[in-house]
From Swiss-Prot:
Protein name: Beta-glucuronosyltransferase GlcAT14C
The keyword S-adenosyl-L-methionine is assigned to this record: no
Glycosylated sites: N156, N285, N306
EC number: 2.4.1.-
Molecular function GO labels: glucuronosyltransferase activity
Species, as recorded: Arabidopsis thaliana (Mouse-ear cress)
Function description: Beta-glucuronosyltransferase involved in the biosynthesis of type II arabinogalactan (AG). Modifies both the beta-1,6-linked galactan and beta-1,3-linked galactan present in type II AG.
Compartments in which it is found: Golgi apparatus membrane
Amino acid sequence: MKRSHISSPRSYSRPAISIFGVFLLFLLVLTLSSRKPSDSSSGLAPNRNLATKSTIPRFAYLVTGTKGDGKRVKRLLKAIHHPRNYYLLHLDLEASDEERMELAKYVRSEKKKFENVMVMGLADLVTEKGPTMLASTLHGVAILLKKAKDWDWFINLSASDYPLMPQDDILHIFSYLPRYLNFIEHTSNIGWKENQRARPIIIDPGFYHLKKSGVFWAKERRSLPASFKLFMGSTSVALTRPFLEFCIWGWDNLPRTLLMYYTNFLLSSEGYFQTVVCNNKDYQNTTVNHDLHYTKWDPLQQRTLNVTVENFRDMVQSGAPFAREFREDDLVLDKIDIELLGQTDTGLELKTPDVVKPTVSWKRLEKLMVRLLDHENFRAKQCK
């Protein structure tokens, strides 16, 4: 029988220790045999980079939605909530003040359980496919950096995302990982996106209008940059606090330079973090090329498809802790709640921040991590 563990030494179950003993040895050898991020400018201390300390981490979640997403955000919050983490909820400016007020009332009504949850009162206008989406994400990051002092990874989720395992299992596995790893899907092989994303110049009216509209296209086109290399990937990320401090503060000016460049870039949220992390020597070796999501992809139309009950088995076998995109109140969400999350209609369980009780789901995530950090995948897929 597995035992719950708390954030003190030697509090993990014996099976977990035996399995992860080999895993940690591999990570330690891998870390020492490769160039580690510099601690001179990145703010990463050497002892922070080793996976020898199995303390429970903290996640900082940014959960975003738009008009009509209040109900979905509430359900998602309930599914991912753990008292050890931090949560920032944002309904963009297209949502009404009443929707934001209703969300804030919901959080206040469960104040004892949701004391680690914040709701953004001053909403951002977010244009689909525009850089205002990136600006809003950076806004959320800045708030979490200011309000929450001790988190380890930032994870962004939209109202159409949903977890595939309890937070206890994710926290359990991440407690064994080096705290410098950035989970971000990325590639420099952009193919057709060069002509449709990199060369066009767009203007996002969301920066200066109060009502949502589409982006404007300029007649001129631009060449590819020469001073940095473009990378693209998923908008979903799990990024470390030190890396995001670098993005916000930008002490070597790369993050600011790239932010200016991506102001006129279509779907800049699919390239900004990827390009920053892969063009900085202190962080390019910290990437794990995965966005921690299961996604059903349509290769012909180049878009994600809605996940249904038919995809349930594939979702589970993927080992991913999250999935996208779900229709509101789809039957598969109920199936996930019952079979994977163990949720009931009795409400939120009052948990203790320093206690983690993993279920059997951690084994699925462990398999995914071992595969991602295998020597044939890890370094070979970093910033290529």
